[in-house]
Amino acid sequence: MYKRIISRLDIKNGILVKGISLEGLRKLGDPIFFSKKYYNDNVDEIHFQDVVATLYGRDILFNIIEKISRKIFVNVSVGGGIKNEHDIDNLLRLGCDKVVINSEAVRNPNFLFLILELPSLAQIIATF
């Protein structure tokens, strides 16, 4: 069996954060710095999750994905704030390999079936 290491980077306000016993967050720093570190440590995939994008109606992590896709060469997945096909197309164009649908999958389960029709999308991860 092939084993893979997938690093998850939780981001809030453009800063890498670490949850503390489900009670709070500690700021760790620049997500681009840490993703390069994990890339150099030979992870197989990096998952970027904006932990409050939907809650605050924030833009998706487009700027971070655009910067990091030029510096690391592993699979990249993104979650947080994805609401429509346009968001997914933008992420794929910037170098994202997978999308993670959270709140929108709960609000609109048909959304998953709609985006399955996108020819450029290879994998969707839905979390409930």
PLM feature segments, named:
Residues 1-74, 82-86, 124-126:
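Conserved N-terminal beta1-alpha1 strand-loop-helix module at the mouth
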Residues 23, 27, 92-94, 115:
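Alpha-helix termini
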Residues 39, 65-70, 92, 113-119:
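Surface-exposed amphipathic alpha-helices with a cationic face
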Residues 11-13, 17-18, 96-128:
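Conserved anion-binding
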Residues 58-61, 88-90, 111-115:
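Short secondary-structure transition/capping segments
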Residues 75, 81-100, 105-109:
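Active-site loop-to-helix "anion-binding N-cap" substructures in soluble metabolic enzymes
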